[in-house]
């Protein structure tokens, strides 16, 4: 028994493995971009990769950037794994160049056809009627308009509607004088109505005169539409001609015979290539129709086919598509972590170098990201907090803080632990919680080597070495290293005791004192209850980590975690550059070749990045 969708299912699975980097045994390197894939899949579609992998067992294949662009190769890779190829005017050349270099013949053929179509649309007036010269008796030097049969009224039809609308102009639909069969009407592709041919009144009055127009003297453009051609039928070539004298503007029909032969599909212009004659109000409007088409085509804004988002440039769309495809071409050469955007990689590298380029003008404090500087200014220097809660009127420095705060009112907890089922309002809180299960402590102190599960805990701990105490009590002036310590001290002024023992009702100002009490007095109590109290009663540090927003204060800069921060293990500790707490490293410090702990390729990577 054969399953009809087995091949599609296999390709779908392989593509998901590629996007996840699972079982990928090769990496295609194009400049700073890296693409993971499977050798057997590439070799099956590309003669180039087939030849490469027959002669080498190397995992990395480096491609020439001048021959294969990263964006073109990405589209080609998607076609190989999915069978889908989206070609447009701004990527077809890159894809064709990549496919031709890598010998993917099927894509080369598709691209050639598409490029011909785009060239036809961009230059519709360049359609050559000479391609059917052998089958059509047409004099290219002169255009002959003969009205011999005008006086024979019964053989002509005049559009009375048009005459009523414009008394100065009439319409003439010429019947065939060379066949007894009823001629089919030439219909508009859009309206389906019969075409009417317009003549100025002075020409109609002298209709018995043969008018010869020299084709070489005709001003451009001449817009041509050719009707469908059948055997033994006549070819109607309708032309809009702008004469040198405005009063003599003419829209005329030329009827020529064609010899027997197969129909010529190239004769009929595509509907969208030129405007319909029926819709032409004045011959002057056709003067720049080709240029207007090119402008409309070039001004078409690229749009994402997945989410419908519109972009001003094709390059922005290509960067956006990496989000949908899961492509992360920007790779940190120091730790191997990959990112979708180049600016994300630069921000991430600062976790290695310690660089903080964004300085506060008031307190000279440095930050790795601009958004952190904005947050700091709003929190500590009186700048406006533009985001206000509709329920309690609290104001916040960032929209994300307001969104998290709103979940306190709604009770929403969208982040669920897949190990124990506990729910959280913040993604970062879930991350910290999972580390309780795994025991992971990726943040290591440079001075003493102590490890922490949360970056804010490391920041607070480092102040013990530097002596920094930025949090000052407004009542007595005493300073502290963390907001948790300040809150604990402040309770000594207010007398508040928020931590209550569930067994005996005693209350304490500090969670540590509550734990000591339970250990000393209730050591034989149910451990489950004690564990539950730990989960629902937060310590001062946990309050910072898990609930950065309280009802009375915003998150502090020290409590924020870098969204792109790299979890450093003990073995990665040597990769941090030696910098002080008060000054960010200069470019010379970052790029000097004598930095310990970096290999030569890593130093080259840093120099190229900056």
Swiss-Prot record:
Polar residues bias (residue ranges): 188-197, 540-550
SMART domains in the record: BTB, ZnF_C2H2
Motif segment (Nuclear localization signal): 174-190, 257-262
Residues covered by the BTB domain: 24-89
Compositional bias per record (Basic and acidic residues), positions renumbered to this chain: 523-539
Localization annotation: Nucleus
Classification via Pfam families: BTB, zf-C2H2, zf-C2H2_6
GO biological process: cellular response to leukemia inhibitory factor; regulation of transcription by RNA polymerase II
CDD domains membership: BTB_POZ_ZBTB31_myoneurin (cd18217)
Keyword annotations from UniProtKB, A to Z: DNA-binding, Metal-binding, Nucleus, Phosphoprotein, Repeat, Transcription, Transcription regulation, Zinc, Zinc-finger
Annotated spans, Disordered: 169-197, 521-556
GO annotations of cellular component type: nucleoplasm
GO molecular function: DNA-binding transcription factor activity, RNA polymerase II-specific; RNA polymerase II cis-regulatory region sequence-specific DNA binding; zinc ion binding
Keyword DNA repair carried by entry: no
Gene3D superfamilies: Classic Zinc Finger, Potassium Channel Kv1.1, Chain A
Tissues where the protein occurs: Mainly expressed in the neuromuscular system. Located in and around synaptic myonuclei in adult muscle. Expression is dysregulated after nerve injury. Also found in the testis, ovary and placenta.
Residues bearing PTM Phosphoserine: 289
ZnF bounds (C2H2-type): 302-324, 330-352, 358-381, 387-409, 415-437, 443-465, 471-493, 499-522
Family (UniProt): Belongs to the krueppel C2H2-type zinc-finger protein family.
The protein, known as: Myoneurin
